[in-house]
Every structure is written in C-alpha cells, then in structure tokens.
Amino acid sequence: MKNKKFLNSFKYAFNGIITSFKTEKNMKFHILMMVLVIIAGILLKISKIEWIICVILFTLVISAELINTAIETIVDMITMEKNEKAKIAKDVAAGAVLVNAIGSAIIGLIIFIPKIINIL
C-alpha cells in the first residue's frame, strides 16, 4: 500500500510538470532556453563543473516557475475579482521566477561567452 502511494506521488508530480508546460507560456520559454543551453553546452564542450552549474540553474528556474504556477492557480481559485493582495501574491511569485531567470542568464553568459570568443 505504501509503495502505491509513493508511486502515485511521482505520477501527481509529473502531471503537475506536464500541466504547467501545457498551460504556461513562460514554462515553454524556460524549457526552450534549457534545450538551447544543453545544445550549446554539447557544441562548446563545457566542463563537468559547468554542466553541474547549468543543471542546478535549470532546476532553480523550472522549480520557481512551477511554484509560481501553483501560487497563481490558488489565488485564482480563491478570487477572480480584482484584489490588491491577490495581485501582490502573484506579482511577488512572478518576481521570484524573474530573479532566478536573470541570475541564470548572467551565469550562462559567464560560462558561454569566453567559449564563443575562443571560437572566433
């Protein structure tokens, strides 16, 4: 019985990821950026440490977007009317994603720009 509950928790988690991908344009954008970084990493032969950094950053951005989606969904479930506190909650959650994405982009530039310059 416990194994079934454990396996179901993975099923529910994957359903959440898939739902977020299907319904959120920003999640699609983050996944696209992740795929492009993976391709660039392969082509530019980034180091093992650089791969680890990229995977950590992928995890942070995707996790932040999933949490943002959950917060937005809960807020919308509670009220669809204009409400300043609901707006603050949604804006702050979106801001957390933006901070992660900007930080990840900066680190990505630090990793990839020298490699691109070396090719030129």
For each feature predicted by the language model, list its residue ranges.
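A contiguous, well-structured "functional interface" segment within a domain
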Residues: M1-K2, N83, A89, S104
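Juxtamembrane helix-capping/reentrant segments at transmembrane boundaries
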Residues: M80-A96
